[in-house]
Amino acid sequence: MTISDHPETEPKWWKEATIYQIYPASFKDSNNDGWGDLKGITSKLQYIKDLGVDAIWVCPFYDSPQQDMGYDISNYEKVWPTYGTNEDCFELIDKTHKLGMKFITDLVINHCSTEHEWFKESRSSKTNPKRDWFFWRPPKGYDAEGKPIPPNNWKSFFGGSAWTFDETTNEFYLRLFASRQVDLNWENEDCRRAIFESAVGFWLDHGVDGFRIDTAGLYSKRPGLPDSPIFDKTSKLQHPNWGSHNGPRIHEYHQELHRFMKNRVKDGREIMTVGEVAHGSDNALYTSAARYEVSEVFSFTHVEVGTSPFFRYNIVPFTLKQWKEAIASNFLFINGTDSWATTYIENHDQARSITRFADDSPKYRKISGKLLTLLECSLTGTLYVYQGQEIGQINFKEWPIEKYEDVDVKNNYEIIKKSFGKNSKEMKDFFKGIALLSRDHSRTPMPWTKDKPNAGFTGPDVKPWFLLNESFEQGINVEQESRDDDSVLNFWKRALQARKKYKELMIYGYDFQFIDLDSDQIFSFTKEYEDKTLFAALNFSGEEIEFSLPREGASLSFILGNYDDTDVSSRVLKPWEGRIYLVK
């Protein structure tokens, strides 16, 4: 029996790949202007290759006014000048391929910038041919002060109403995110065709191998854009998911997009897509090979554990059991199907995983970072690693609001200040929340060296666009970790080698079973491939603890662990210790 005899494990390059995510503003500055750029990425391709990575995913580098760090695109076919030129990007794609890696780019097509020519035309008059390319609605009415009332009660993902009033034609436009990130109307066929040609076709013609599809579940809104039912009784505005997520035509749109990609590529290369769908009720539909939608999806269930569904910065207590079940939900849906999964715990929208899910204290930062590496590398699905994760980066310490760059943080700070005051309990809770959960924790510049003040990200006399995390002074940087065999960086390299060596079990393994599900310290499980069984025993606590065998009398053959000085035959795990075994 071979891998391909299992429908859910038909071999594909993108299933077996480890994909390294790059946030261009913060990766490497090549020209000392304080911003990362495409030439900076090109200069570090060998470093990425040496990790054991098979593909890179580069976050948006397109022309943009940068209200939301490039996720507000004003021209899909042009590189933002601060990042370089189109020729710089073509060179990056070419050199990535020459090193044997694939190139994946971000596809941001739920919305565009209000500076895009499409929107400029649309807003010019109610009779413009592109008027219906966006969601325009008249006010629901006017309040006592004569201010226009938004068309419905949807809340923006970034706080406040999801509608912005435009005085040009005295109507509102829908924008589920920032005020100048206007939602495109996929119901309009001409709009869809323009999106496909400009945002997709142009880059396929220049050799990209795949797309991470941003906000992939939002393209089909609930018809008529009605008021949302009241889920959050503390607010007049309601989370927009009810009206905007997984709408009636969402799968039709993704099938249409898939057909466009397949027809556009003439050289036989297989294009992969990973859809950011947020929550997973439709994951098996999105990823079924027979349905021709997307290759795989990102779900948020496991990274949203410990947060409120109504406000992402409200910290909610959670148990290890809850986190285990959330993680498993990312891949259990593929059992017995032709679907596929992903495994990740960090990206540009999440805080650092060691701080959130392990122990970022000096005593356990390194060992618990390796524990998370073991967990992620042992899970079924395509593996994603975010820049800085491979060196065990942690959250920065608490900063005043002036130091934050994230538009989401800034918007919500102003809303809370206006509603409750700067010294309110709500504001104190907000600062606790952003200290743990802000997206900015993942967006600080990459520390390449130990050199002050800028850790090799940019020149020593340059002010970087964003403050560096001072952890580079405590050894969390590429230079020092490269020379330390015991570093998180070198452990990642060994773990990725093991993942390739045991790919049948680690990448394609099925029949996942928890061993100690109810334990709030031990994360242990088995999974199988043919007659082979993998067993993982991971201690998510600062105490020594005994783990249970997968079955009585089981014989274990050690594969990899995060402690060098441990008795791998012992059933007692040290604090934050993890081991991976073959079961005989």
Curated annotation (Swiss-Prot):
Present with 5060 molecules/cell in log phase SD medium. The record marks D349 as: Transition state stabilizer. It comes from the Eukaryota. GO terms for biological process: maltose catabolic process; sucrose catabolic process. It holds the Pfam family Alpha-amylase. GO terms for cellular component: plasma membrane. This is Alpha-glucosidase MAL12. InterPro entries: Glyco_hydro_13_cat_dom (IPR006047), Glyco_hydro_b (IPR013780), Glycoside_hydrolase_SF (IPR017853), O16G_dom_2 (IPR045857). Its EC number is 3.2.1.20. It is an enzyme of class 3 (hydrolase). The active site is at D214, E276. Belongs to the glycosyl hydrolase 13 family. GO terms for molecular function: alpha-1,4-glucosidase activity; alpha-amylase activity; glucan 1,4-alpha-maltotriohydrolase activity; oligo-1,6-glucosidase activity; sucrose alpha-glucosidase activity. The lineage of its organism: Eukaryota, Fungi, Dikarya, Ascomycota, Saccharomycotina. Keywords: Glycosidase, Hydrolase, Maltose metabolism. The gene is MAL12. It catalyses: Hydrolysis of terminal, non-reducing (1->4)-linked alpha-D-glucose residues with release of alpha-D-glucose.
